[in-house]
Amino acid sequence: MKARNGLQAIAFTGASLAVAAWTSSPKGRELDLQAFKELNRDRGPAADAVFGGVTELGSIWASAGAAAVLAVGGRRRAAARGLTAAGLAWLAGQGLKRVVGRTRPYLDDREGTRLLIGEPRATSWPSSHPAVLLAFVTVAGRELRVGALGRTGLAALAGLVGVSRSYLGVHYPSDVVGGLLLGRAVGVALSD
């Protein structure tokens, strides 16, 4: 890992932890809840279906599938490194969930939350789906020498996965931001 990448990874990790600390303040919690309620609002069955599908792109299984496609296509190094990044982001996210222990939105307010998927077992912060996808696309994108515009599009897709997590009722927006920062930290740390 280059020194610059190490410093960036530390900065993204620090920013992620700052988000967690901010949401423990009364004002941070209030703003997070307001943003969640707006994102979780009913927008009809088409939006439910789109976000229900988009969210799966952030699963570790989607990363495994993408890695398999890359490997079959002769891009084994990109596949292996991308999947390694996704796996490390997932493991880090699961570990942080146990440390932070934040309750999920649908448990905080069962009546006011639209829960559109099954209840996840782990706690809420950080959101692993955007972390996994952003770590994968950061590393695989660099391995594949994807241009800046393509990498921006892939990062935006990870952001959309994050939005889907709030829309579906399983994460506060700050969980998503924490997950995106974690995924970026892992991706940068593992990039050449």
Language-model segments: which ranges?
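N-terminal transmembrane-helix/juxtamembrane module of multi-pass inner/ER membrane proteins
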Residues: 1-62, 94-122
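Alpha-helical transmembrane segments of integral membrane proteins
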Residues: 4-12, 77-85, 149-153, 174-178
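Alpha-helical transmembrane segments of multi-pass membrane proteins
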Residues: 20-23, 86-97, 157-161, 165, ...
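Membrane-water interface at transmembrane helix exits
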Residues: 36, 71, 93-101, 141, ...
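Membrane-helix interface segments
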Residues: 46-47, 75-78, 106, 146-150
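Interfacial segments of alpha-helical transmembrane regions
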Residues: 68-92
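Transmembrane helix-loop junctions in multipass membrane proteins, especially transporters and channels
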Residues: 75, 101-106, 170-174
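Membrane-embedded catalytic cores of phosphoryl/pyrophosphoryl-handling enzymes
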Residues: 110-192
